[in-house]
Amino acid sequence: MSRHDSLYFADGTLTLQDLDGTLFNVYRHHFIAKSGFFSGMLTLPSPDQPTPIQNASNGISDSTAVPLPPNFTTVEYEKFLNFIFNVGSLDIPLVTDLCAILKTSHFFAAESGVQYAVHYLQAHANFPAALRFRMGCDYSIVSWVKAAFDDLVAVPVIDMTVEDEALLGTQAFRALVLTQAKVTDHRMSLAVCPPLPTHATWCRNPAYCQTQWESAWTSIAGPLGWLIKEELSGAEIHNKLDLWVPMAMTGECRLLTCSRLKEDLKREEVIIDSAVTALIRLVVV
Protein backbone atom coordinates (compact mmCIF):
# COMPACT_ATOMS: atom_id res chain seq x y z
CA MET A 1 0.00 0.00 0.00
CA SER A 2 1.11 3.57 -0.65
CA ARG A 3 -0.41 6.94 0.16
CA HIS A 4 -1.32 9.19 -2.75
CA ASP A 5 0.91 12.26 -2.98
CA SER A 6 -1.80 14.92 -3.22
CA LEU A 7 -5.04 13.15 -2.32
CA TYR A 8 -4.09 11.90 1.12
CA PHE A 9 -5.14 14.85 3.27
CA ALA A 10 -3.51 15.10 6.70
CA ASP A 11 -6.86 16.05 8.27
CA GLY A 12 -8.95 13.69 6.12
CA THR A 13 -11.70 11.66 7.79
CA LEU A 14 -12.17 8.82 5.30
CA THR A 15 -9.47 6.53 3.94
CA LEU A 16 -10.09 4.78 0.62
CA GLN A 17 -8.02 2.15 -1.18
CA ASP A 18 -8.11 1.26 -4.87
CA LEU A 19 -7.33 -2.09 -6.46
CA ASP A 20 -3.64 -1.19 -6.90
CA GLY A 21 -3.23 -0.44 -3.19
CA THR A 22 -3.16 3.35 -3.49
CA LEU A 23 -4.58 5.04 -0.39
CA PHE A 24 -6.64 8.25 -0.53
CA ASN A 25 -7.63 10.15 2.62
CA VAL A 26 -10.49 12.57 2.01
CA TYR A 27 -13.29 14.41 3.82
CA ARG A 28 -16.20 12.08 4.54
CA HIS A 29 -19.02 14.66 4.73
CA HIS A 30 -17.96 16.44 1.54
CA PHE A 31 -17.68 13.12 -0.27
CA ILE A 32 -21.16 12.04 0.86
CA ALA A 33 -22.62 15.37 -0.29
CA LYS A 34 -21.11 15.03 -3.76
CA SER A 35 -21.76 11.35 -4.51
CA GLY A 36 -25.07 9.54 -4.33
CA PHE A 37 -23.24 6.21 -4.41
CA PHE A 38 -21.04 6.99 -1.42
CA SER A 39 -23.88 8.74 0.37
CA GLY A 40 -25.78 5.47 0.43
CA MET A 41 -22.71 3.46 1.35
CA LEU A 42 -21.21 5.72 4.01
CA THR A 43 -24.21 7.27 5.74
CA LEU A 44 -24.73 5.74 9.17
CA PRO A 45 -27.87 3.57 9.35
CA SER A 46 -30.51 3.67 12.04
CA PRO A 47 -29.66 1.68 15.19
CA ASP A 48 -31.76 -1.32 14.17
CA GLN A 49 -30.08 -1.62 10.75
CA PRO A 50 -26.72 -3.31 10.05
CA THR A 51 -23.78 -1.00 9.35
CA PRO A 52 -23.01 -0.89 5.57
CA ILE A 53 -19.28 -0.67 6.26
CA GLN A 54 -18.04 -3.22 8.74
CA ASN A 55 -15.38 -2.38 11.32
CA ALA A 56 -12.78 -4.15 9.20
CA SER A 57 -13.19 -1.45 6.53
CA ASN A 58 -14.65 1.62 8.18
CA GLY A 59 -12.18 4.06 6.61
CA ILE A 60 -10.84 5.54 9.86
CA SER A 61 -7.26 4.40 9.22
CA ASP A 62 -4.99 2.96 6.54
CA SER A 63 -5.50 -0.54 7.88
CA THR A 64 -9.29 -0.22 7.70
CA ALA A 65 -9.48 1.67 4.38
CA VAL A 66 -12.74 1.39 2.45
CA PRO A 67 -12.07 -0.64 -0.71
CA LEU A 68 -13.00 1.24 -3.88
CA PRO A 69 -14.79 -0.66 -6.66
CA PRO A 70 -12.28 -2.26 -9.08
CA ASN A 71 -13.98 -0.69 -12.11
CA PHE A 72 -11.46 2.14 -12.51
CA THR A 73 -7.72 2.73 -12.59
CA THR A 74 -5.74 4.77 -10.08
CA VAL A 75 -5.46 7.59 -12.64
CA GLU A 76 -9.24 7.64 -13.15
CA TYR A 77 -9.80 7.79 -9.40
CA GLU A 78 -7.28 10.65 -9.25
CA LYS A 79 -9.22 12.67 -11.83
CA PHE A 80 -12.50 12.00 -10.05
CA LEU A 81 -11.21 12.95 -6.60
CA ASN A 82 -9.32 15.95 -7.98
CA PHE A 83 -12.64 17.23 -9.30
CA ILE A 84 -14.64 16.40 -6.17
CA PHE A 85 -12.13 18.11 -3.86
CA ASN A 86 -10.97 20.79 -6.30
CA VAL A 87 -7.33 19.71 -6.22
CA GLY A 88 -5.03 21.02 -8.95
CA SER A 89 -6.08 23.00 -12.01
CA LEU A 90 -8.53 21.96 -14.69
CA ASP A 91 -8.80 25.37 -16.37
CA ILE A 92 -8.09 23.76 -19.73
CA PRO A 93 -9.14 20.14 -19.11
CA LEU A 94 -7.84 17.41 -21.39
CA VAL A 95 -10.24 15.06 -23.15
CA THR A 96 -8.77 12.10 -21.26
CA ASP A 97 -9.33 13.86 -17.92
CA LEU A 98 -12.91 14.76 -18.81
CA CYS A 99 -13.69 11.22 -19.97
CA ALA A 100 -12.33 9.84 -16.70
CA ILE A 101 -14.48 12.30 -14.73
CA LEU A 102 -17.56 11.40 -16.78
CA LYS A 103 -17.03 7.64 -16.35
CA THR A 104 -16.43 7.78 -12.61
CA SER A 105 -19.04 10.45 -11.87
CA HIS A 106 -21.68 8.50 -13.77
CA PHE A 107 -20.86 5.33 -11.83
CA PHE A 108 -20.74 7.06 -8.44
CA ALA A 109 -23.85 9.20 -9.08
CA ALA A 110 -21.93 12.46 -8.78
CA GLU A 111 -24.19 14.68 -10.86
CA SER A 112 -21.94 17.74 -10.68
CA GLY A 113 -19.09 15.72 -12.20
CA VAL A 114 -21.29 14.43 -15.01
CA GLN A 115 -22.50 17.94 -15.85
CA TYR A 116 -18.97 19.34 -15.72
CA ALA A 117 -17.54 16.67 -18.03
CA VAL A 118 -20.41 16.83 -20.52
CA HIS A 119 -20.24 20.64 -20.63
CA TYR A 120 -16.55 20.74 -21.51
CA LEU A 121 -16.51 17.70 -23.78
CA GLN A 122 -19.47 19.07 -25.73
CA ALA A 123 -17.39 21.87 -27.25
CA HIS A 124 -13.89 20.40 -26.93
CA ALA A 125 -11.94 20.84 -30.16
CA ASN A 126 -9.92 17.66 -29.57
CA PHE A 127 -12.79 15.26 -28.84
CA PRO A 128 -12.36 12.57 -31.55
CA ALA A 129 -15.53 11.46 -33.33
CA ALA A 130 -15.04 7.76 -32.54
CA LEU A 131 -14.54 8.50 -28.83
CA ARG A 132 -17.52 10.87 -28.83
CA PHE A 133 -19.60 8.07 -30.34
CA ARG A 134 -18.48 5.56 -27.69
CA MET A 135 -19.05 7.94 -24.78
CA GLY A 136 -22.44 8.90 -26.20
CA CYS A 137 -23.45 5.23 -26.36
CA ASP A 138 -22.12 4.37 -22.91
CA TYR A 139 -23.71 7.34 -21.16
CA SER A 140 -26.91 7.72 -23.19
CA ILE A 141 -26.00 11.06 -24.78
CA VAL A 142 -27.88 10.59 -28.04
CA SER A 143 -26.81 13.95 -29.52
CA TRP A 144 -23.16 12.82 -29.33
CA VAL A 145 -23.96 9.56 -31.13
CA LYS A 146 -25.65 11.42 -33.98
CA ALA A 147 -23.00 14.14 -34.31
CA ALA A 148 -20.16 11.62 -34.21
CA PHE A 149 -21.76 9.33 -36.79
CA ASP A 150 -22.37 12.29 -39.11
CA ASP A 151 -18.66 13.17 -38.88
CA LEU A 152 -17.50 9.58 -39.33
CA VAL A 153 -19.55 9.08 -42.50
CA ALA A 154 -17.22 11.64 -44.13
CA VAL A 155 -14.08 9.72 -43.05
CA PRO A 156 -12.90 7.08 -45.56
CA VAL A 157 -12.70 3.68 -43.87
CA ILE A 158 -9.09 3.34 -45.00
CA ASP A 159 -8.22 6.39 -42.86
CA MET A 160 -9.75 4.97 -39.68
CA THR A 161 -7.46 3.49 -37.05
CA VAL A 162 -7.74 0.19 -35.23
CA GLU A 163 -8.52 2.22 -32.10
CA ASP A 164 -11.40 3.95 -33.92
CA GLU A 165 -12.84 0.60 -34.95
CA ALA A 166 -12.55 -0.73 -31.40
CA LEU A 167 -14.36 2.31 -30.01
CA LEU A 168 -17.18 1.95 -32.53
CA GLY A 169 -17.64 -1.78 -32.04
CA THR A 170 -18.66 -4.32 -34.68
CA GLN A 171 -22.30 -3.28 -35.08
CA ALA A 172 -21.57 0.43 -35.41
CA PHE A 173 -18.59 -0.09 -37.72
CA ARG A 174 -20.68 -2.30 -40.01
CA ALA A 175 -23.49 0.28 -40.00
CA LEU A 176 -20.96 2.99 -40.85
CA VAL A 177 -19.52 1.07 -43.81
CA LEU A 178 -23.01 0.33 -45.19
CA THR A 179 -24.07 3.95 -44.75
CA GLN A 180 -20.96 5.23 -46.51
CA ALA A 181 -21.67 2.89 -49.42
CA LYS A 182 -25.27 4.14 -49.71
CA VAL A 183 -24.16 7.78 -49.54
CA THR A 184 -21.50 7.15 -52.21
CA ASP A 185 -24.05 5.46 -54.49
CA HIS A 186 -26.40 8.40 -54.07
CA ARG A 187 -23.68 10.94 -54.81
CA MET A 188 -22.43 9.05 -57.85
CA SER A 189 -25.94 8.89 -59.27
CA LEU A 190 -26.10 12.67 -58.98
CA ALA A 191 -22.59 13.09 -60.38
CA VAL A 192 -23.23 11.11 -63.57
CA CYS A 193 -26.71 12.55 -64.10
CA PRO A 194 -26.42 16.27 -63.35
CA PRO A 195 -29.77 17.96 -62.77
CA LEU A 196 -31.05 20.18 -65.53
CA PRO A 197 -30.86 23.87 -64.67
CA THR A 198 -33.96 25.60 -63.39
CA HIS A 199 -34.37 28.91 -65.21
CA ALA A 200 -35.81 32.13 -63.89
CA THR A 201 -38.89 33.34 -65.75
CA TRP A 202 -36.92 36.31 -67.10
CA CYS A 203 -33.86 34.29 -68.21
CA ARG A 204 -33.05 35.71 -71.68
CA ASN A 205 -30.93 32.84 -72.98
CA PRO A 206 -31.84 29.49 -71.38
CA ALA A 207 -29.71 27.51 -73.85
CA TYR A 208 -26.58 29.52 -73.05
CA CYS A 209 -27.35 29.37 -69.34
CA GLN A 210 -27.65 25.58 -69.56
CA THR A 211 -24.32 25.32 -71.39
CA GLN A 212 -22.64 27.33 -68.64
CA TRP A 213 -24.20 25.12 -65.98
CA GLU A 214 -23.05 21.91 -67.68
CA SER A 215 -19.56 23.30 -68.18
CA ALA A 216 -19.30 24.40 -64.57
CA TRP A 217 -20.71 21.08 -63.37
CA THR A 218 -17.95 19.04 -64.96
CA SER A 219 -15.25 21.19 -63.36
CA ILE A 220 -13.41 19.47 -60.51
CA ALA A 221 -13.83 22.76 -58.61
CA GLY A 222 -17.62 22.55 -58.93
CA PRO A 223 -20.39 20.25 -57.65
CA LEU A 224 -19.03 17.21 -59.49
CA GLY A 225 -15.69 17.57 -57.73
CA TRP A 226 -17.36 18.00 -54.36
CA LEU A 227 -19.59 14.97 -54.80
CA ILE A 228 -16.66 12.63 -55.46
CA LYS A 229 -14.75 13.82 -52.40
CA GLU A 230 -15.61 11.43 -49.59
CA GLU A 231 -14.21 13.75 -46.93
CA LEU A 232 -16.87 16.41 -47.61
CA SER A 233 -20.08 16.01 -45.65
CA GLY A 234 -23.46 16.83 -47.15
CA ALA A 235 -23.63 19.97 -44.99
CA GLU A 236 -20.27 21.15 -46.33
CA ILE A 237 -21.45 20.67 -49.92
CA HIS A 238 -24.57 22.70 -49.08
CA ASN A 239 -22.37 25.53 -47.80
CA LYS A 240 -20.20 25.42 -50.91
CA LEU A 241 -23.27 25.63 -53.14
CA ASP A 242 -24.31 28.84 -51.38
CA LEU A 243 -20.98 30.45 -52.35
CA TRP A 244 -20.54 28.89 -55.78
CA VAL A 245 -20.82 31.25 -58.76
CA PRO A 246 -20.40 29.50 -62.14
CA MET A 247 -19.18 31.84 -64.87
CA ALA A 248 -21.78 33.64 -66.96
CA MET A 249 -24.76 31.78 -65.52
CA THR A 250 -27.67 34.01 -64.59
CA GLY A 251 -27.66 34.58 -60.85
CA GLU A 252 -31.31 33.72 -60.30
CA CYS A 253 -30.98 30.58 -62.41
CA ARG A 254 -27.98 29.50 -60.34
CA LEU A 255 -29.87 29.97 -57.07
CA LEU A 256 -32.89 28.03 -58.31
CA THR A 257 -30.76 25.21 -59.69
CA CYS A 258 -28.60 24.94 -56.58
CA SER A 259 -31.73 24.93 -54.44
CA ARG A 260 -33.02 21.96 -56.41
CA LEU A 261 -29.67 20.21 -56.06
CA LYS A 262 -29.82 20.74 -52.29
CA GLU A 263 -33.17 18.98 -52.24
CA ASP A 264 -31.61 16.04 -54.09
CA LEU A 265 -28.74 15.99 -51.59
CA LYS A 266 -31.17 15.80 -48.68
CA ARG A 267 -31.59 12.13 -49.53
CA GLU A 268 -28.11 11.74 -48.03
CA GLU A 269 -29.36 13.13 -44.72
CA VAL A 270 -32.24 10.65 -44.75
CA ILE A 271 -29.82 7.75 -45.29
CA ILE A 272 -27.62 8.84 -42.38
CA ASP A 273 -30.51 9.63 -40.03
CA SER A 274 -32.10 6.23 -40.68
CA ALA A 275 -28.81 4.49 -39.91
CA VAL A 276 -28.32 6.49 -36.69
CA THR A 277 -31.88 5.82 -35.50
CA ALA A 278 -31.47 2.08 -36.01
CA LEU A 279 -28.04 2.13 -34.39
CA ILE A 280 -29.20 4.02 -31.30
CA ARG A 281 -31.74 1.30 -30.59
CA LEU A 282 -28.96 -1.28 -30.70
CA VAL A 283 -25.99 0.30 -28.96
CA VAL A 284 -27.08 3.13 -26.64
CA VAL A 285 -27.20 1.99 -23.02
Task: Please place each PLM-identified region on the residue numbering.
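Long, hydrophobic/aromatic-enriched structural stretches that serve as scaffold segments
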Residues: 58-119, 199, 203, 207
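Long, hydrophobic, well-ordered secondary-structure blocks that form the structural core
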Residues: 121-123
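BTB/POZ-protein C-terminal extensions
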Residues: 1-67, 89-90, 126-285
